[in-house]
Amino acid sequence: MGWHDGCIRCMVGVPFASVIATVLCFAGVALFCGCGHEALSGTEKLIETYFSKNYQEYEYLIHVINAFQYVIYGIAIFFFLYGILLLAEGFYTTTAIKHILGEFKPPAMKGGLISTVTGGPPKGRSTRGRQPVHTIELICRCLGKWLGHPDKFVGVTYVITILWILIFACSAVPVYIYFNTWVTCQSIAFPGKTTTSVSTLCLDARMYGVLPWNAFPGKVCGTSLLAICKTSEFQMTFHLFIAAFVGAAATLVALLTYMVGASFNYAVLRVTGRSDRSKF
């Protein structure tokens, strides 16, 4: 019976929304960073193979791609650490809320998060002498004092969400370019569906700002473009950009879920604090 009660208490304190958001965030970031990195490398190969033979014409593009790839490394590391912090914050604040509302009473939360959130003094301390503090308990207390303020995470997560919306919008640009290229190739493959001459159907990389206007040839037309679309490099890069876009969307959903959960926890703690920790 004691084991069953312990499991029930643990399940009550689990922030399911934060757990789901963390899994979604890690999966989305992994998809965005991994596929985005490889898609940028594939784009570099396509440009230097089919659209320009002079290295100086696409040298700046290579530097930009390398810079984006380093940014991707930073994004992966940041979201890994921040996702863990948000998950820990969800556990701490959910446990504190359940304790305040009388739904959950953790046995070993003395002087940690609950007293930090509720403002109450630590309870149950012995006056006979101070007990030795283990390293893990000390770390938990330090985390509790910092994580017990969901208002901090609401503001930070809000700013991160705004920035990620911009990244999400930027990740749609290469998908749009590759999709237009694929549509053009379909028109070349089935000339009966269009009245335009096949030789005039082209993809001009200079038009999208990928190459300078003096780049040669800079564009590919007709059957040459169709041959590029049939290559495994083009197909793989196109699908990798789509996967990266989906990963960015999943990460955005995870951030919104985090923000809603942190806002709810903050609101509940504020309301219960103003009403002298009364239930509602």
Swiss-Prot record:
The keyword Secreted does not apply. Residues 1-10, 89-152, 270-280 are cytoplasmic. A lipid is attached at C7, C10, C140, C142 (S-palmitoyl cysteine). Pfam families: Myelin_PLP. Its main location: membrane. Disulfide bonds join C185-C229, C202-C221. GO terms for molecular function: structural constituent of myelin sheath. Keywords: Cell membrane, Disulfide bond, Lipoprotein, Membrane, Palmitate, Transmembrane, Transmembrane helix. It comes from the Eukaryota. The chain crosses the membrane at residues 11-36, 60-88, 153-179, 240-269. GO terms for cellular component: myelin sheath; plasma membrane. GO terms for biological process: axon development; central nervous system myelination. The keyword Nucleus does not apply. InterPro entries: Myelin_PLP, Myelin_PLP_CS. Signal peptide: none annotated. It is a multi-pass membrane protein. It is found in: Cell membrane. Residues 37-59, 180-239 are extracellular. This is the major myelin protein from the central nervous system. It plays an important role in the formation or maintenance of the multilamellar structure of myelin. Belongs to the myelin proteolipid protein family. This is Myelin proteolipid protein B.
